[in-house]
Amino acid sequence: MKYRKFIILVLSILIILPVSTLDGHHIANADDDSPKKLKYKENSALALNYHRVRKANFLNNFIYFFSSSKEIKNYSVSQSQFESQIKWLKSHDAKFLTLKEFLYYKKKGKFPKRSVWINFDDMDETIYENAYPILKKYKIPATGFIITGHVGEENFHNLDMISKKELKEMYKTGLWEFETHTHDLHNLSKNNKSKLMKASEATIIKDLNKSEKYLTKNFKKSQKTIAYPYGLMNDDKLPVIKKAGLKYGFSLEEKAVTPNSNDYYIPRILISDDAFEHLIKRWDGFHEKDET
C-alpha cells in the first residue's frame, strides 16, 4: 500500500513539474537548449551561474531523469555533480575570483588565465545545504544574488529561501559576497513579463534602494551590482538601473566575459550538467599552454 502511494506521488510530481514555472526562469531560455561550444578569446573569464543544487537522493534522481521540466534540467545540478565540477575546475588550474576581483580585472582590462567567478541566483535553501559546504571545503569564493525582500521566506514560488542567520554564517567565512536580485521585483506579471521590466521608474528605484539598504546593513558595502531577474534587461530600463546607483548588471548568456563586455550586460553561463560538459570542459581557455 505504501509503495502504491509512493508511485502515485511520484507520477503526480512528474505531471505537475513540466507545467510549473517555479520561479519562471525558463522564459529566458532560447528554444534550442542544446549547448554550443564557447567562442574563445584571449583575456577572458567565465562567470558560472547556478540556481539549485539538489540532494542526490533516489526521489530527486528519479524526478530528474523522468521529468521534462526545464526548471529541473536547466536550472539545477545535483550535489555530487556540483562537487565534481568544482574538482574539475581545480584540477585544470582555474583561478577562482571574488566578485570584487572579477570587477577589478575587468576594469583593469586584463583577466588572469583561466579566471572563473562562481555565482548563484535567488539563494534558496539548496544552496546553503548542498553548495555552501562544498565551497567551504575547497575554499572557493562565491557571490550570492539575493531577493532581499524574501529572505527566509518559505514557499516563495515553490522555493524555501535561505534565512538571514544562514546568510550571515556564510558571510563570516570570508568566502561569500552578496548582491541584489531585486528586493521584491523577482516575479512574473499575468502575461509572463518580468515584473522589473514592467515597473515604473519610481517603483524600480524604491525597490533597489531597499535592497541596497538591506545589503549594506547586513553585509557591509556591496559592489553596486545586480543580477537581473530571469537574466532579462533592455536598453529602455537601463537609465533607471543607473539612476538607482548600480554600476554593473548581469544577464544570462552563453559567452565568456571580456574587458570589453558591456558593464550592464555582463554574460553569465547558466550551469547544468550538460552545459558544464559541453561548454565549460571544452572551453579552449582550459586547454591552452602557459607561456614559458
Swiss-Prot record:
One of its GO terms (molecular function) is hydrolase activity, acting on carbon-nitrogen (but not peptide) bonds, in linear amides. Disulfide bonds: none annotated. Keywords: Cell wall, Hydrolase, Secreted, Signal. Residues 1-28 form the signal peptide. GO terms for cellular component: extracellular region. Gene3D superfamilies: Glycoside hydrolase/deacetylase. It is found in: Secreted, Cell wall. Pfam families: Polysacc_deac_1. Belongs to the polysaccharide deacetylase family. In strain COL, the gene icaC is interrupted by a natural frameshift. Catalyzes the N-deacetylation of poly-beta-1,6-N-acetyl-D-glucosamine (PNAG, also referred to as PIA), a biofilm adhesin polysaccharide. N-deacetylation is crucial for attachment of the polysaccharide to the bacterial cell surface; it leads to the introduction of positive charges in the otherwise neutral PIA polymer, allowing electrostatic interactions. This is Poly-beta-1,6-N-acetyl-D-glucosamine N-deacetylase.
